[in-house]
Amino acid sequence: MSAQASKPVPVETQHEDMIHDAQLDYYGKRLATCSSDRTIRIFNVIKGEAKGEPVILKGHTAAVWQVSWAHPSFGSILASCSYDGRVFIWKEVGQGQGKGSGGELQDGWERIKEHTLHTASVNSIAWAPYDLGPILACASSDGKVSVLSFQNDGSIEVNIFPAHGTGANAISWAPSVLSTVSGVSRSQQPSNSLAPQKRFVTAGSDNLIRIWGFDEEQKKWTEEETIKGHEDWVRDVAWAPNIGLPGMYIASASQDRTVLIHSRPSPSSSWTSAPLLPSLPQSQDPHFPDAVWRVSWSLAGNVLAVSCGDGKVSLWKEGVGKGWECVSDFSS
């Protein structure tokens, strides 16, 4: 099966070093990029193209690895994480406004919060599904994960715990689903027994991915699953949205040149893992040409983008009874 991806549109970012991340906001009207040049740049996107001069945000003292937009219901807010071990929260406040504790106003953006509890590079950040509230999860080379819950009074509740002994490289939230009493269907339960579950997956330098859930009674994060399968560092992990789809899917990308799809058809079943096959299917070779750095799902959760160290991006879909198939690829 084949499919045509739209032609890539280049963006002249004016970054002075390697670009590590690029993220569109919820509406697709703004593009944020970050780089080893220690800056973040924000572009307006008009008809699919970045227009005008970017806003340049400075403050990190080392490479900026990732940026992440909050849901617009919380305002125009962007988080960034860096090799300097810090996480910044930026807010658009408009020219001539802003008086938070974070620092000076930069082109209408203000650094309103700074998270400094990690002792090594913060490699990945992710905002929770919006119905869980303004919650940011962070994964660090110090082996710990921190979860920042922003309160209405402006304070931050921080929960930090060890996740991967040799370093946490990536983090991704599960889609928001309602918790249910075991053995009772959702339709049979009173409405007050339902609450959105907090759950995410992490990837580590211990070659593992781990699934964590929040225990509402004990008010702490607990490990629910450990999934093996990779033979080297797991560079990225992505939990698929499940809009109209049965079951759950998690994709993981590794230094071992493989991508694994971990699936669970129902809450009562076990996780199973299967590799993508970038070579001819009959060869059954799961290895990409180089280390795989990023995986990202489409909004509907039915297409997976894979970014490889050879500079190519491939798009994958699950075929009917045929496993996962590459439907398009292009050079980045």
From Swiss-Prot:
The keyword Membrane applies. It comes from the Eukaryota. It is a peripheral membrane protein. It holds the Pfam family WD40. WD repeats lie at residues 14-53, 59-100, 117-158, 163-222, 229-272, 287-326. PROSITE patterns: WD_REPEATS_2 (PS50082), WD_REPEATS_REGION (PS50294). Its main location: membrane. Component of the coat protein complex II (COPII) which promotes the formation of transport vesicles from the endoplasmic reticulum (ER). The coat has two main functions, the physical deformation of the endoplasmic reticulum membrane into vesicles and the selection of cargo molecules. It also functions as a component of the nuclear pore complex (NPC). NPC components, collectively referred to as nucleoporins (NUPs), can play the role of both NPC structural components and of docking or interaction partners for transiently associated nuclear transport factors. Belongs to the WD repeat SEC13 family. This is Protein transport protein SEC13. It comes from Cryptococcus neoformans var. neoformans serotype D (strain JEC21 / ATCC MYA-565). The lineage of its organism: Eukaryota, Fungi, Dikarya, Basidiomycota, Agaricomycotina.
